[in-house]
């Protein structure tokens, strides 16, 4: 594409790192440290080296904006350790701007942390069960929401790449009757894994718990079936009207 490209990190070619994660790890470090980036400039077709000083920054996992008809559009990229705070702020900002309805976009969302999922749903749902976990021995953990809830029409966009926590976000809102689910049937990942480092440097992930929706439904192999089927692979297709059942 017509962009500048990072070609090396501290003198080591990008291709030699072997993976994206290893390249990112080479860039990261303590704030104030310096990293040398090799850049191929598209406009000049020249290779240059830039010295970049590391600084602390907050990853943005939630973005929002107002669409036509006062639809508050909120995109959740994934459920990370700061997603819940960003989500709560986005919901409040859309309400402040006068949103008449909310549209949550979880297409291609890979899931993430259980705590972030629970806190995001707690912002929206009334008092009740959010999600439960059960281990091999049958021990169950339940997560609940408080009485505070958002009283606006809602819809959730999902697709065939909405995964894990993203699926349970949609399922909870669907079961509570709080949102219309629009899009494609989701993956159907309903369990959690724990990683164990191996002596050869590898990692073994073992499934440890099964997740269940507020009504006790497992999504394993089934996923979430949308209320309204739609091809949502094109990210530009995000202008959906959010209607109450009586208006649909």
Regions found by a protein language model. Name each.
Residues 2-38, 116, 189-190, 195:
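PDZ domains, with a preference for the canonical peptide-binding region formed by the helix
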Residues 7, 21-63, 139:
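PDZ-domain C-terminal substructure recognizer with occasional recognition of PDZ-binding tails
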Residues 11, 54, 76:
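Active-site donor-binding loop signature of nucleotide-sugar glycosyltransferases
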Residues 13-14, 55, 226-227:
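A short acidic/small-residue loop/turn micro-motif
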Residues 62-248:
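C-terminal "post-core" interaction segments
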